[in-house]
Curated annotation (Swiss-Prot):
Entries under SUPFAM superfamilies matching the protein: Homing endonucleases
Residues annotated to bind DNA: 278-311
Function: Involved in cell division and chromosome segregation.
Entry-linked InterPro entries: Homing_endonucl, Intein_endonuc_central, Sporu_reg_WhiA_N_dom, Sporulation_regulator_WhiA, Sporulation_regulator_WhiA_C, WhiA_LAGLIDADG_dom
Keyword Cell division: yes
Any single Pfam family the record assigns to this protein: LAGLIDADG_WhiA
GO molecular function: DNA binding; endonuclease activity
Cysteines engaged in disulfide bonds, as pairs: none
Designated name of the protein: Probable cell division protein WhiA
UniProt keywords, alphabetically: Cell cycle, Cell division, DNA-binding
Length: 319
Protein backbone atom coordinates (compact mmCIF):
# COMPACT_ATOMS: atom_id res chain seq x y z
CA UNK A 1 0.00 0.00 0.00
CA UNK A 2 1.44 3.36 -1.02
CA UNK A 3 1.98 6.22 1.41
CA UNK A 4 -0.81 8.17 -0.32
CA UNK A 5 -3.30 5.31 0.02
CA UNK A 6 -2.34 4.80 3.68
CA UNK A 7 -2.95 8.50 4.30
CA UNK A 8 -6.40 8.34 2.70
CA UNK A 9 -7.28 5.19 4.65
CA UNK A 10 -6.46 7.06 7.85
CA UNK A 11 -8.57 10.06 6.81
CA UNK A 12 -11.49 7.81 5.88
CA UNK A 13 -11.63 6.59 9.48
CA UNK A 14 -12.08 10.12 10.85
CA UNK A 15 -15.71 10.95 11.66
CA UNK A 16 -16.29 14.63 12.54
CA UNK A 17 -18.44 15.13 15.63
CA UNK A 18 -20.06 18.44 14.76
CA UNK A 19 -22.75 18.53 12.10
CA UNK A 20 -21.26 21.64 10.49
CA UNK A 21 -17.96 19.78 9.93
CA UNK A 22 -19.76 16.68 8.69
CA UNK A 23 -21.63 18.79 6.15
CA UNK A 24 -18.46 20.60 5.05
CA UNK A 25 -16.54 17.37 4.47
CA UNK A 26 -19.47 15.76 2.68
CA UNK A 27 -19.87 18.85 0.47
CA UNK A 28 -16.19 18.66 -0.52
CA UNK A 29 -16.44 14.95 -1.34
CA UNK A 30 -19.48 15.49 -3.56
CA UNK A 31 -17.95 18.55 -5.23
CA UNK A 32 -14.78 16.58 -6.02
CA UNK A 33 -16.30 13.30 -7.20
CA UNK A 34 -20.02 13.97 -7.53
CA UNK A 35 -22.39 14.38 -10.47
CA UNK A 36 -26.05 15.31 -10.88
CA UNK A 37 -28.34 12.68 -12.38
CA UNK A 38 -32.01 12.55 -13.32
CA UNK A 39 -33.96 9.30 -13.16
CA UNK A 40 -37.65 8.44 -13.50
CA UNK A 41 -37.87 6.98 -10.01
CA UNK A 42 -35.84 9.36 -7.84
CA UNK A 43 -35.91 12.43 -10.03
CA UNK A 44 -32.87 14.64 -9.48
CA UNK A 45 -30.14 13.06 -7.36
CA UNK A 46 -26.50 13.63 -6.47
CA UNK A 47 -24.19 10.69 -7.17
CA UNK A 48 -20.63 10.17 -6.02
CA UNK A 49 -18.24 7.42 -7.19
CA UNK A 50 -15.06 6.18 -5.53
CA UNK A 51 -12.71 3.22 -5.85
CA UNK A 52 -12.05 3.26 -2.11
CA UNK A 53 -14.30 1.07 0.03
CA UNK A 54 -13.31 3.00 3.17
CA UNK A 55 -14.19 6.33 1.51
CA UNK A 56 -17.54 4.89 0.41
CA UNK A 57 -18.29 3.80 3.99
CA UNK A 58 -17.36 7.25 5.24
CA UNK A 59 -19.67 8.97 2.74
CA UNK A 60 -22.46 6.57 3.77
CA UNK A 61 -21.96 7.44 7.47
CA UNK A 62 -21.76 11.18 6.78
CA UNK A 63 -25.02 11.14 4.79
CA UNK A 64 -26.73 9.29 7.62
CA UNK A 65 -25.33 11.69 10.24
CA UNK A 66 -26.16 14.90 8.33
CA UNK A 67 -29.46 14.05 6.65
CA UNK A 68 -30.71 11.14 8.74
CA UNK A 69 -31.18 8.77 5.80
CA UNK A 70 -29.57 5.50 4.79
CA UNK A 71 -28.49 5.28 1.20
CA UNK A 72 -27.48 2.25 -0.80
CA UNK A 73 -23.97 1.61 -2.04
CA UNK A 74 -23.90 0.18 -5.54
CA UNK A 75 -20.77 -1.82 -6.33
CA UNK A 76 -19.59 -1.98 -9.93
CA UNK A 77 -16.55 -3.79 -11.26
CA UNK A 78 -14.25 -2.18 -13.77
CA UNK A 79 -13.67 -4.28 -16.87
CA UNK A 80 -10.46 -2.62 -17.91
CA UNK A 81 -7.00 -2.24 -16.45
CA UNK A 82 -6.96 -3.28 -12.76
CA UNK A 83 -10.61 -4.41 -12.75
CA UNK A 84 -11.11 -2.81 -9.34
CA UNK A 85 -14.47 -2.12 -7.70
CA UNK A 86 -16.20 1.23 -8.03
CA UNK A 87 -18.59 2.22 -5.25
CA UNK A 88 -21.50 4.45 -6.26
CA UNK A 89 -23.64 6.30 -3.71
CA UNK A 90 -26.71 8.33 -4.70
CA UNK A 91 -28.39 11.00 -2.60
CA UNK A 92 -31.83 12.44 -3.50
CA UNK A 93 -31.83 16.17 -4.19
CA UNK A 94 -34.63 16.65 -1.66
CA UNK A 95 -35.14 14.78 1.60
CA UNK A 96 -38.28 15.51 3.60
CA UNK A 97 -38.65 18.96 2.09
CA UNK A 98 -34.98 19.81 2.64
CA UNK A 99 -32.95 21.00 -0.32
CA UNK A 100 -29.85 18.80 -0.05
CA UNK A 101 -28.07 20.44 -2.97
CA UNK A 102 -28.47 23.91 -1.49
CA UNK A 103 -27.32 22.81 1.97
CA UNK A 104 -24.10 21.44 0.48
CA UNK A 105 -23.60 24.51 -1.67
CA UNK A 106 -24.08 22.65 -4.96
CA UNK A 107 -26.94 25.00 -5.93
CA UNK A 108 -27.81 28.52 -4.80
CA UNK A 109 -31.08 29.85 -3.38
CA UNK A 110 -32.47 30.32 -6.91
CA UNK A 111 -31.75 26.72 -7.84
CA UNK A 112 -28.85 27.55 -10.14
CA UNK A 113 -25.55 25.70 -10.00
CA UNK A 114 -23.12 27.27 -7.52
CA UNK A 115 -19.47 27.38 -8.51
CA UNK A 116 -18.37 28.22 -4.98
CA UNK A 117 -19.31 26.69 -1.63
CA UNK A 118 -21.26 29.19 0.49
CA UNK A 119 -19.27 31.22 3.02
CA UNK A 120 -21.55 29.88 5.77
CA UNK A 121 -20.19 26.39 5.07
CA UNK A 122 -16.58 27.49 5.65
CA UNK A 123 -16.86 30.23 8.27
CA UNK A 124 -15.44 28.08 11.11
CA UNK A 125 -11.86 26.86 11.12
CA UNK A 126 -12.95 23.33 12.07
CA UNK A 127 -15.20 23.29 8.98
CA UNK A 128 -12.38 24.53 6.75
CA UNK A 129 -10.22 21.65 8.01
CA UNK A 130 -13.04 19.20 7.30
CA UNK A 131 -13.57 20.63 3.81
CA UNK A 132 -9.87 20.26 2.97
CA UNK A 133 -9.95 16.71 4.30
CA UNK A 134 -12.89 15.88 2.04
CA UNK A 135 -11.19 17.52 -0.95
CA UNK A 136 -8.01 15.50 -0.35
CA UNK A 137 -9.99 12.28 0.03
CA UNK A 138 -11.83 13.02 -3.19
CA UNK A 139 -8.91 14.07 -5.39
CA UNK A 140 -5.68 14.29 -3.46
CA UNK A 141 -2.40 12.41 -3.33
CA UNK A 142 0.91 12.73 -1.50
CA UNK A 143 4.28 11.32 -2.47
CA UNK A 144 6.23 9.08 -0.16
CA UNK A 145 8.76 11.17 1.80
CA UNK A 146 11.44 8.77 0.53
CA UNK A 147 11.14 10.48 -2.86
CA UNK A 148 10.35 13.99 -4.05
CA UNK A 149 8.18 16.02 -1.68
CA UNK A 150 4.82 16.66 -3.36
CA UNK A 151 1.18 16.89 -2.25
CA UNK A 152 -1.62 17.78 -4.63
CA UNK A 153 -5.39 18.01 -5.01
CA UNK A 154 -6.78 17.69 -8.54
CA UNK A 155 -10.10 19.18 -9.65
CA UNK A 156 -11.71 19.85 -13.02
CA UNK A 157 -13.06 23.21 -11.82
CA UNK A 158 -10.76 26.24 -11.96
CA UNK A 159 -12.90 28.15 -9.47
CA UNK A 160 -12.78 25.28 -7.00
CA UNK A 161 -8.99 25.08 -7.42
CA UNK A 162 -8.76 28.76 -6.53
CA UNK A 163 -10.97 28.25 -3.47
CA UNK A 164 -8.84 25.34 -2.26
CA UNK A 165 -5.71 27.43 -2.77
CA UNK A 166 -7.24 30.30 -0.78
CA UNK A 167 -8.24 27.93 2.02
CA UNK A 168 -4.68 26.66 2.24
CA UNK A 169 -3.38 30.24 2.27
CA UNK A 170 -5.64 30.93 5.27
CA UNK A 171 -3.70 28.21 7.10
CA UNK A 172 -0.40 29.82 6.13
CA UNK A 173 0.40 27.41 3.28
CA UNK A 174 1.70 28.81 -0.01
CA UNK A 175 -0.16 26.50 -2.38
CA UNK A 176 0.28 26.90 -6.11
CA UNK A 177 -2.13 26.06 -8.94
CA UNK A 178 -1.19 24.61 -12.32
CA UNK A 179 -3.19 23.26 -15.26
CA UNK A 180 -2.65 19.88 -16.85
CA UNK A 181 -4.82 18.50 -19.68
CA UNK A 182 -7.98 20.25 -18.57
CA UNK A 183 -7.42 19.54 -14.88
CA UNK A 184 -6.37 22.04 -12.23
CA UNK A 185 -3.78 20.97 -9.67
CA UNK A 186 -3.42 22.63 -6.29
CA UNK A 187 -0.06 21.55 -4.91
CA UNK A 188 2.57 21.92 -2.19
CA UNK A 189 6.27 21.16 -2.69
CA UNK A 190 7.95 22.05 0.62
CA UNK A 191 8.23 19.27 3.19
CA UNK A 192 7.34 21.56 6.14
CA UNK A 193 4.15 22.68 4.41
CA UNK A 194 3.16 19.10 3.55
CA UNK A 195 3.61 18.18 7.22
CA UNK A 196 1.39 21.13 8.19
CA UNK A 197 -1.24 20.08 5.63
CA UNK A 198 -1.31 16.53 7.03
CA UNK A 199 -1.83 18.03 10.48
CA UNK A 200 -4.64 20.31 9.26
CA UNK A 201 -6.65 17.46 7.75
CA UNK A 202 -6.02 15.15 10.72
CA UNK A 203 -3.65 12.59 9.18
CA UNK A 204 -1.53 12.36 12.32
CA UNK A 205 -0.16 8.84 11.77
CA UNK A 206 0.86 9.76 8.23
CA UNK A 207 2.43 12.93 9.61
CA UNK A 208 4.57 10.96 12.10
CA UNK A 209 5.64 8.51 9.40
CA UNK A 210 6.46 11.40 7.08
CA UNK A 211 8.51 13.15 9.76
CA UNK A 212 10.40 9.97 10.71
CA UNK A 213 11.38 9.31 7.12
CA UNK A 214 12.23 12.97 6.57
CA UNK A 215 14.53 13.01 9.63
CA UNK A 216 16.32 9.83 8.57
CA UNK A 217 16.56 11.14 5.01
CA UNK A 218 17.97 14.43 6.25
CA UNK A 219 20.54 12.69 8.43
CA UNK A 220 21.51 10.42 5.54
CA UNK A 221 21.94 13.41 3.24
CA UNK A 222 23.99 15.23 5.87
CA UNK A 223 26.26 12.20 6.33
CA UNK A 224 26.66 11.92 2.56
CA UNK A 225 27.58 15.59 2.33
CA UNK A 226 30.15 15.20 5.11
CA UNK A 227 31.60 12.08 3.49
CA UNK A 228 31.75 13.80 0.11
CA UNK A 229 33.41 16.82 1.69
CA UNK A 230 35.94 14.66 3.54
CA UNK A 231 36.60 12.67 0.37
CA UNK A 232 37.11 15.86 -1.63
CA UNK A 233 39.48 17.24 1.01
CA UNK A 234 41.36 13.94 1.15
CA UNK A 235 41.68 13.89 -2.64
CA UNK A 236 43.04 17.44 -2.56
CA UNK A 237 45.54 16.46 0.15
CA UNK A 238 46.68 13.37 -1.78
CA UNK A 239 46.99 15.30 -5.05
CA UNK A 240 48.97 18.05 -3.33
CA UNK A 241 51.26 15.51 -1.63
CA UNK A 242 51.94 13.72 -4.93
CA UNK A 243 52.65 17.02 -6.67
CA UNK A 244 54.97 18.09 -3.85
CA UNK A 245 56.78 14.73 -3.88
CA UNK A 246 57.39 14.95 -7.62
CA UNK A 247 58.60 18.53 -7.26
CA UNK A 248 60.96 17.65 -4.38
CA UNK A 249 62.44 14.71 -6.31
CA UNK A 250 63.04 17.09 -9.21
CA UNK A 251 64.85 19.47 -6.83
CA UNK A 252 66.81 16.57 -5.32
CA UNK A 253 67.95 15.27 -8.73
CA UNK A 254 68.70 18.63 -10.37
CA UNK A 255 69.80 20.81 -7.49
CA UNK A 256 70.60 18.44 -4.64
CA UNK A 257 69.51 18.76 -1.04
CA UNK A 258 73.05 19.76 -0.04
CA UNK A 259 72.57 23.05 -1.93
CA UNK A 260 69.36 23.90 -0.06
CA UNK A 261 69.01 25.97 3.10
CA UNK A 262 68.50 23.79 6.18
CA UNK A 263 64.84 24.80 6.60
CA UNK A 264 63.97 23.76 3.03
CA UNK A 265 66.13 20.63 3.18
CA UNK A 266 64.42 19.46 6.38
CA UNK A 267 60.88 19.84 5.07
CA UNK A 268 61.84 18.28 1.71
CA UNK A 269 63.30 15.19 3.40
CA UNK A 270 60.26 14.81 5.67
CA UNK A 271 57.85 15.07 2.74
CA UNK A 272 59.69 12.29 0.88
CA UNK A 273 59.80 10.19 4.04
CA UNK A 274 56.12 10.76 4.91
CA UNK A 275 54.26 11.29 1.60
CA UNK A 276 50.82 10.79 3.21
CA UNK A 277 51.33 13.19 6.11
CA UNK A 278 49.31 16.39 6.29
CA UNK A 279 50.94 19.82 6.51
CA UNK A 280 50.07 19.95 10.20
CA UNK A 281 51.72 16.58 10.82
CA UNK A 282 54.84 17.61 8.88
CA UNK A 283 55.05 20.79 10.91
CA UNK A 284 54.99 18.84 14.17
CA UNK A 285 57.94 16.72 12.97
CA UNK A 286 60.14 19.74 12.33
CA UNK A 287 62.64 20.97 14.89
CA UNK A 288 61.48 23.35 16.15
CA UNK A 289 57.83 22.58 15.18
CA UNK A 290 56.05 25.04 12.88
CA UNK A 291 52.44 25.51 11.87
CA UNK A 292 50.67 24.59 8.64
CA UNK A 293 51.29 28.00 7.11
CA UNK A 294 55.01 27.73 7.85
CA UNK A 295 55.25 24.31 6.19
CA UNK A 296 53.23 25.55 3.24
CA UNK A 297 55.52 28.57 2.88
CA UNK A 298 58.63 26.35 2.74
CA UNK A 299 57.05 24.02 0.19
CA UNK A 300 56.15 27.02 -1.96
CA UNK A 301 59.77 28.19 -1.83
CA UNK A 302 60.85 24.73 -2.99
CA UNK A 303 58.29 24.91 -5.79
CA UNK A 304 59.61 28.33 -6.83
CA UNK A 305 63.13 26.90 -6.95
CA UNK A 306 62.00 24.01 -9.13
CA UNK A 307 60.14 26.35 -11.51
CA UNK A 308 63.10 28.72 -11.73
CA UNK A 309 65.51 25.88 -12.44
CA UNK A 310 63.19 24.47 -15.08
CA UNK A 311 62.93 27.85 -16.85
CA UNK A 312 66.61 28.81 -16.69
CA UNK A 313 68.19 25.40 -16.96
CA UNK A 314 70.57 26.20 -14.11
CA UNK A 315 70.74 26.28 -10.37
CA UNK A 316 69.28 29.46 -8.87
CA UNK A 317 70.67 30.81 -5.66
CA UNK A 318 68.55 30.37 -2.52
CA UNK A 319 69.81 32.69 0.19
Amino acid sequence: MSFSVETKEELARIQPRRRCCQLAELAALFRMDGSLQISGEQGLSLTVSTESASSARKIFRLIKAVFGVQTQILVRRKRRLKKSNVYVISLPARIGGRDVLQEMGITDSQGGFSFEPPSELLKRQCCRRAYLRGAFLGGGSVNSPEGTYHLEIITNDETHARILSELLHRFGLTAKVSQRKGWFIVYLKESEQIVEMLSIIGAHSALLNFENVRIVKGMRNQVNRLVNCETANLNKTVDAALRQTEMIRFVQNRIGFANLPSQLREVAELRLQYPDASLKELGQMLNPPVGKSGVNHRLRRLESLAEAFSRQGGVPRED
